A protein has these predicted regions:
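Conserved CoA-thioester-binding segment of acyl-CoA-metabolizing enzymes
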Residues: 1-64
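Short Cys/His-rich "knuckle" micro-motifs
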Residues: 67
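Residue-level signature of transmembrane alpha-helix interfaces in integral membrane proteins
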Residues: 42, 76-77
Length: 77
């Protein structure tokens, strides 16, 4: 299996003590939101809501170009 064939998850979730860090992981598309991102962020927020030990949630974007470009217009069309 080649590196290109390995699909990365659209959203990464990491626990840092009492903080849940949600990373939108689509830097090649400026982290724009498609169906997988929407579901992944929603699931992570639900996870945080159900965990009494989570005191804060941080949402960030992968890469160094942008946080999130908005909706993925290519996925919508």
């Amino acid at each position: 299996m080649t590196e290109a064939a390995v699909q990365q998850p659209a959203v990464l979730v990491e626990r840092r003590d009492d903080v849940l860090v949600i990373t939108i992981n689509r830097p090649e598309a400026r982290n724009c939101v498609n169906g997988a991102v929407s579901i992944g962020v929603g699931d992570a927020l639900e996870q945080a809501q159900l965990d009494a030990d989570v005191r804060a949630v941080v949402i960030t974007g992968a890469g160094d170009k942008s946080f999130c470009a908005g909706a993925d217009l290519k996925a919508i069309s």
